[in-house]
Amino acid sequence: MILLGIGSSFVFLTLLKMKGEAIRLSPLFNSAVMLRNAGELIAATSICLALAYVPISTIGAIIQTVPLMITAVAALFLGERVGIRRALAIGVGFLGALFFVQPGDANFDTMTGLVFVSAIGMTIRDVGTKLVSDSFSTLLLSFYSCVLFASSGVILLLFTGGVSSPDANITVLFLAMVALGSLAVIFMTEAVRLGDMSVVSPFRYTRLLFSLVAGVIILDERVNAMMLFGSALTIGAGLYIWRRELTLNA
């Protein structure tokens, strides 16, 4: 995490220099940026710790609750009107997540709770990103995100201990992660800031597809019928909310 955060920070630092944009500290004291950064720190720390203990397919399924959480937060704190249909859909979506993780099962890992904490952090981050003023550039916000990601690695290092040196194969993967991660941060931040949340949200569900494929094919994880049913409930609820929002805003 530390190396990835530092590497990505240098990428954005270079892009900022190329655009002639100064690194300002004043945005760090903006309330919306502070909210976004707090969510980023919570999400990054908890998700990376969860990756060491929780199957990636489970992580992908739980993260799909983020659009549901955003809708709930918009209703509770941002004054958005959410009718009974969307409220019920939110409940169904969370029920689907419970079906997937199966908390009563003998194989349930309590570390799964870290993924829910990360989902809450992502929700806080996305809401904060939406509230950030247009006067703050996406590159600058992305630079802050990478610095926070490296800081999260330092925090985890204090608790876990131990530092390992990467070999040649890991170094290649690390460089690929820096490149792809930097692009992902830019595109994600830009989409959330400029796009309509109801349009952006459905694309989040592709993460579950990728995590399931990676978990089953690459990591040899097992997915049962109950987990697939839970995934269908969560995705179906999210897509219903998205469709309902489009209908109401038409």
Label every model-predicted segment:
Residues 3, 60-65, 132-148, 185-216:
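Helix-helix packing/entry segments at the starts of transmembrane helices
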Residues 106-131, 250:
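Glycine-/small-residue-enriched transmembrane alpha-helix faces in small-molecule transporters
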Residues 6-35, 84, 136, 147-175, ...:
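Membrane-interface interhelical linkers
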Residues 27-37, 82-94, 111-116, 135-148, ...:
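Cytoplasmic-side transmembrane-helix entry/capping segments in multi-pass membrane proteins
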Residues 85-102, 226-245:
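Hydrophobic transmembrane alpha-helices of multi-pass small-molecule transport proteins
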Residues 13, 37-45, 67-72, 97, ...:
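Hydrophobic/small/kink-forming positions within alpha-helical transmembrane segments
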Residues 95-107, 157-174, 216, 220-225:
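Membrane-interface helix termini and inter-helical loops of multi-pass transporters
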Residues 47-49, 66-88, 209-228:
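C-terminal transmembrane-helix exit sites in multi-pass transporters
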